[in-house]
Design a protein with these regions (language model features):
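Acidic/histidine-rich helix-loop elements
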Residues: 52-63, 89-90, 181
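Histidine-centered catalytic micro-motifs
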Residues: 46-56, 172-176, 208
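Active-site beta-loop-alpha junctions enriched in small/polar residues
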Residues: 52-54, 85-87, 119-123, 147-149, ...
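Divalent metal-coordination and catalytic microenvironments
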Residues: 50, 72, 103, 116, ...
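Catalytic pocket-lining loop regions of alpha/beta-barrel enzymes
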Residues: 139-143, 150, 154-257
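Mid-to-C-terminal alpha-helical segments outside catalytic/metal-binding sites
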Residues: 2-49, 62, 66-79, 133, ...
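Active-site gating/metal-coordination segments in enzymes
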Residues: 78-82, 86, 94-179
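Alpha-helical scaffolding within the catalytic cores
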Residues: 63-68, 98-102, 130, 190-194, ...
Length: 298
């Protein structure tokens, strides 16, 4: 083997498998049982607001999903708010319905541990609305997931937002702001777009996804300063110092949500290591998301 050869990049799936195996070697304790979504007095569950289940067209999806749960166990994550995306986008109505059906099955398999986002493509307006209502009302999904099929300020998105408002569930919206176009994502929304959408629908519960996902996190945080209806998902693989503290200073702790987007150790370490007091960390790690989820009557 040539020692100068560049190693193959490690995929997130390989990392999750390795992390789960390493954690198992280091601790013989069994996975912790799931706690009720209503916390015991003085306790707040740790809720990952941004996670993904694996599409069933992938070999080994069962092992990948199990690895996600096992890593969450080892890192002290009590709840995973999960969506599943179609392998090809824009998603067809049949495609997103299939994904949501599999998410519902995972919710049943991991009773109370996996919370579902209903993924839809607003480009199929009636099918999207019907699917959101079916998922939330019949299967207990906790929110809506929108990806990059349409910029969030496109009028085709508005009926989806109105449905989420009516059902009193949040929308986790894929977002990013770079200083060059995102390849393959011409319709990606950014923090400014979500702020504009929030001005149109101030009652909407919007979540700007993965501020640490590789774009300009400082720009995104500043863009959301005057959009109190938008929460910030702190997930992503970028581990720059000071992101959490900067967001807490400009937006306030109550608007920040813990998330991993599959970068599990980075997501947990970012909050655990932040220069904030324990009360602020508890809000970010679960209290703020718990408050959002509590807005829909049970």
């Amino acid at each position: 083997m040539n020692s100068d050869a560049t190693p193959d990049p490690i995929s997130r799936r390989d990392f999750l498998r390795g992390a789960a195996a390493s954690a198992a070697l280091g601790a013989a304790a069994p996975p912790r049982p799931a706690r009720a979504i209503t916390p015991l007095p003085g306790e707040i569950p740790v809720i990952d607001c941004h996670a993904h289940l694996h599409h069933h067209s992938r070999d080994g999806w069962q092992a990948d999903d199990l690895a996600l749960i096992e890593v969450a166990d080892r890192l002290g994550i009590d709840r995973l708010c999960c969506s599943m995306l179609t392998p090809r986008r824009p998603a067809s109505a049949e495609g997103f319905r299939e994904c949501n059906r599999w998410v519902a099955e995972a919710m049943a398999r991991h009773d109370g541990r996996v919370l579902g986002y209903c993924y839809v493509n607003p480009g199929h307006p009636q099918e999207a609305i019907d699917e959101i209502r079916r998922c939330v009302e019949d299967h207990g999904f906790i929110g809506v997931k929108l990806y990059n099929e349409h910029r969030c300020t496109d009028p085709v998105v508005f009926p989806v937002v109105e449905a989420a408002i009516d059902l009193r569930v949040p929308i986790l919206h894929h977002a990013g702001h770079g200083h060059h176009p995102y390849p393959g994502q011409p319709n990606i929304s950014d923090g400014g777009d979500l702020a504009e959408l929030s001005r149109r629908y101030p009652e909407a519960m919007l979540i700007c996804a993965h501020v640490c996902g590789g774009g300009d996190w400082e720009w995104t945080i500043k863009a959301l300063r005057h959009a109190p209806g938008v929460r910030l998902d702190l997930s992503g693989s970028v581990t720059d110092d000071g992101v959490v503290e900067y967001a807490a200073d400009l937006l306030g702790v109550d608007r920040l949500l813990f998330g991993c987007d599959m970068s599990m150790t980075a997501g947990v370490g970012r909050i655990r290591g932040a220069d904030l007091d324990d009360e602020a960390k508890a809000k970010i790690l679960g209290g703020n998301m718990l408050e959002l989820l509590g807005r829909r009557p049970s």
